[in-house]
Amino acid sequence: MNAKIRYGLSAAVLALIGAGASAPEILDQFLDEKEGNHTTAYRDGTGIWTICRGAILVDGKPVVPGMKLSKEKCDQVNAIERDKALAWVEKNIKVPLTDPQKAGIASFCPYNIGPGKCFPSTFYRRINAGDRRGACEAIRWWIKDGGRDCRIRSNNCYGQVSRRDQESALACWGIDR
């Protein structure tokens, strides 16, 4: 079974991991694939106005309908959001992590569900207790979007299920070796 099928990760992400890329490089590629990079404001799956790779604030101000940014400004916003997510992981996750693990946790916890939902989560308790497999299992439980069960394809959010599988694969990268 090839790695793409086994982990659901793109060839680009797997190549970065294989080349020993840093967490910011892996996270940038992963988020580009999952979030896209929109220079015009749009509503996310829960109706929140976002821009670039899902940012809800630009220069401290909320994203509003009709907001447009240059690609260069989105690159700047994306770098700030990426760095904040990775800094959150460094500060709050108490076990040693590899770069792929940092990227997976940064995508899941601070970037996607937010710290407010992460801190009380089973994932957070398990990872900091050293139960890596249990933590990675708990990532896969976060498959609702705006109250919709994303396992039901007609709810049009099945990408959330795939994303959680991929974040889980990254967060547990290498623990079976």
UniProtKB/Swiss-Prot annotation:
It catalyses: Hydrolysis of (1->4)-beta-linkages between N-acetylmuramic acid and N-acetyl-D-glucosamine residues in a peptidoglycan and between N-acetyl-D-glucosamine residues in chitodextrins. Its main location: host cell. Coiled coil: none annotated. The keyword Hydrolase applies. It is an enzyme of class 3 (hydrolase). Keywords: Antimicrobial, Bacteriolytic enzyme, Cytolysis, Glycosidase, Host cell inner membrane, Host cell lysis by virus, Host cell membrane, Host membrane, Hydrolase, Membrane, Signal-anchor, Transmembrane, Transmembrane helix, Viral release from host cell. One of its GO terms (cellular component) is membrane. Its EC number is 3.2.1.17. GO terms for biological process: cell wall macromolecule catabolic process; defense response to bacterium; killing of cells of another organism; peptidoglycan catabolic process. It is found in: Host cell inner membrane. The active site is at E35 (proton donor/acceptor), D44 (proton donor/acceptor). It is a single-pass type II membrane protein. GO terms for molecular function: lysozyme activity. The chain crosses the membrane at residues 1-24. The keyword Hydrolase applies. The signal-anchor, which may also be an uncleaved signal sequence tethers the SAR-endolysin to the membrane until the latter is depolarized by the holin, resulting in the escape of SAR-endolysin from the membrane. Signal-arrest-release (SAR) endolysin with lysozyme activity that degrades host peptidoglycans and participates with the pinholin and spanin proteins in the sequential events which lead to programmed host cell lysis releasing the mature viral particles. Once the pinholin has permeabilized the host cell membrane, the SAR-endolysin is released into the periplasm where it breaks down the peptidoglycan layer. Belongs to the glycosyl hydrolase 24 family. This is SAR-endolysin. It comes from Enterobacteria phage H19B (Bacteriophage H19B).
